[in-house]
């Protein structure tokens, strides 16, 4: 440490002896110094020697146990003036110089500003690209889950698994928006601005209404008298239903629902789809499309819905990559939080896309290829996000991603989570089981993002 700094520390210590503060912030700063270096609010010669070691006037030995301090944050000159009741235009003279000496001495000894700079240090460019590329690669592997999990779709327990992951996606997306992205867009710091409690209240308001609404529906609903039709394997054997064929709904994604007419039923109850009707929820129009799912048709024979889904999904993944890239430039932990939210959302999203592409006329290989190609646009978004985050203020990207996460979680996935139960709930016990699974998924996602936000300063990715 420079000798000039040691001399400054000694001068400050001498200056404090000129005044005898009995109250106010100067007493708190003095107690911080005396509690660490002295005993019983006094300083012996040996203890003064340790203080001199800390200031660099003597060789330093051992580490300090700071304990509980009154002020353990970085204070600017304006902050020190304000704490002592001085305005920014006040001129410090010998009569009031001793009042601010303990504050300056405390800042010199404990270096809170250096800790703040270390905490706010941005990751290196290689770390940003490395962790960003790894995160996007893991997320893109979710596009392959459609092929792996297709055999499980017909299992009785699969709706419960999918319900949990949809709830998990809602919890992580919503929490990431209110805890990370939107506050970052406004320039808030969770350690300084103390917005976390208010963000928890926002989630609490949403969850409370969800819990009350679902509970009332379970208590007041009369099961077995639904206004929609359940399809069983024996339904397709009656003549009446042969003349009036029903339609079987497929998963709804991006505002589009596919309905397949059951033409041939195998003895085990599995249905071959010879035609698919694509119904857009926006205009209500229906387009027939030939479907031969297990062969490789020409691209011109594939339904328009497949290309619309592929393009929309590519744009969606581009924005996801943009958010990950901008988050990684800010901090690796912020990038991890955003990546977790996107990963949880991609699992049910990509699975639904895969099923729709199959029923639009693509073969399994074609659906897998185009689903993966649309997922690769996330790399392009990652590159743009890193470039913007390193050269410009990324706040606008965080605001855009925060709004997108809120829309996907509340306007897209939340209704889907409720609609997917219509054909599965047969009684109050089943309804309660799915309700608990929904709660488990949402609360798991909420807790994960909350813990990352609260302990962001204590977690280091190296």
Curated annotation (Swiss-Prot):
Chemical reaction(s) catalysed: Zn(2+)(out) + 2 hydrogencarbonate(out) = Zn(2+)(in) + 2 hydrogencarbonate(in); selenite(out) + Zn(2+)(out) + hydrogencarbonate(out) = selenite(in) + Zn(2+)(in) + hydrogencarbonate(in); Mn(2+)(out) + 2 hydrogencarbonate(out) = Mn(2+)(in) + 2 hydrogencarbonate(in); Cd(2+)(out) + 2 hydrogencarbonate(out) = Cd(2+)(in) + 2 hydrogencarbonate(in)
Motif (XEXPHE-motif): 345-350
Signal peptide range: 1-19
pH dependence text: Optimum pH is 7.5.
Transmembrane segments: 133-153, 161-181, 192-212, 368-388, 391-411, 432-452
Top-level lineage group: Eukaryota
Keyword Membrane: yes
Tissue-specific expression: Ubiquitously expressed.
Extracellular side: 20-132, 182-191, 389-390, 453-462
A single GO cellular-component term on record: apical plasma membrane
Glycosylation, residue list: 40, 88, 96
Disulfide feature: none
A single BP term in Gene Ontology: cellular detoxification of cadmium ion
PTM description: N-glycosylated. N-glycosylation is not required for proper iron and zinc transport.
Keywords, comma-separated and alphabetical: Cell membrane, Glycoprotein, Ion transport, Lysosome, Membrane, Signal, Symport, Transmembrane, Transmembrane helix, Transport, Zinc, Zinc transport
Membrane topology: Multi-pass membrane protein
Regions of this protein lying in the Cytoplasmic compartment: 154-160, 213-367, 412-431
Cellular localization per UniProt: Cell membrane; Apical cell membrane; Basolateral cell membrane; Lysosome membrane
Induction context: Up-regulated in monocytes upon adhesion and recruitment to arteries. Up-regulated by the pro-inflammatory cytokine interleukin-1 beta/IL1B.
Subunit structure: Homodimer.
Similarity comment: family membership: Belongs to the ZIP transporter (TC 2.A.5) family.
PANTHER family linked to this entry: METAL CATION SYMPORTER ZIP8 (PTHR12191:SF2), SOLUTE CARRIER FAMILY 39 (PTHR12191)
Name assigned to this protein: Metal cation symporter ZIP8
Species: Mus musculus (Mouse)
Gene responsible for this protein: Slc39a8
């Amino acid at each position: 440490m420079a000798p000039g700094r040691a001399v400054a520390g000694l001068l400050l210590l001498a200056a404090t002896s000129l005044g005898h503060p009995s109250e106010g912030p100067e007493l708190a700063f003095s107690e911080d110094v005396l509690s660490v270096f002295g005993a019983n609010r006094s300083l012996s010669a040996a203890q003064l020697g340790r203080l001199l070691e800390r200031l660099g006037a003597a060789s330093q030995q051992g580490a300090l146990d700071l304990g509980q301090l009154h002020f353990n944050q970085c204070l600017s000159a304006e902050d020190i003036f304000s704490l002592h009741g001085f305005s920014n235009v006040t001129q410090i003279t010998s009569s009031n110089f001793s009042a601010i000496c303990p504050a300056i001495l405390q800042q010199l000894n404990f270096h809170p500003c250096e800790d703040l700079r270390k905490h706010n240090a941005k990751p290196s460019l290689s770390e940003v690209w490395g962790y960003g590329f790894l995160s996007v690669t893991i997320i893109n592997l979710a596009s392959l889950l459609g092929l792996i999990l297709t055999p499980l779709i017909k299992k009785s327990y699969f709706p419960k698994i999918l319900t949990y992951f949809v709830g998990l996606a809602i919890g992580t997306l919503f929490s990431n928006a209110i805890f990370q992205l939107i506050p970052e867009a406004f320039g808030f710091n969770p350690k300084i601005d103390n917005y976390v409690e208010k963000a928890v209240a926002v989630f609490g308001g949403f969850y409370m209404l969800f819990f009350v609404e679902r509970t009332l529906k379970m208590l007041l609903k009369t099961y077995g008298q639904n206004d929609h039709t359940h399809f069983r394997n024996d339904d397709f054997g009656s003549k009446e239903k042969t003349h009036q064929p029903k339609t079987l709904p497929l998963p709804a994604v991006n505002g589009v629902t596919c309905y397949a007419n059951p033409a041939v039923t195998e003895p085990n109850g599995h249905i071959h789809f010879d035609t698919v009707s694509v119904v857009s929820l926006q205009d209500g129009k229906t387009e027939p499309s030939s479907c031969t799912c297990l062969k490789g048709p020409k691209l011109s024979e594939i339904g328009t819905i497949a290309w619309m889904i592929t393009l929309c999904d590519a744009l969606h993944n581009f924005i996801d990559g943009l958010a990950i890239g901008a988050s990684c430039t800010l901090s690796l932990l912020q990038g991890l939080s955003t990546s977790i939210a996107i990963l949880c959302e991609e699992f049910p999203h990509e699975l639904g896309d895969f099923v729709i592409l199959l029923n639009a006329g693509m073969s399994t290989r074609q659906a897998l290829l185009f689903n993966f190609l649309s997922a690769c646009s996330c790399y392009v978004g990652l590159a743009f996000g890193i470039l913007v985050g390193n050269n410009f203020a990324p706040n606008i990207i965080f605001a855009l991603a925060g709004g997108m996460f809120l829309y996907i979680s509340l306007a897209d996935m939340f209704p889907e989570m409720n609609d997917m139960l219509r054909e599965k709930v047969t009684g109050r016990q089943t309804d309660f089981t799915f309700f608990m699974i929904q709660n488990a998924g949402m609360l798991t996602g909420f807790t994960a993002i909350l813990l990352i936000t609260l302990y962001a300063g204590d977690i280091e990715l190296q």
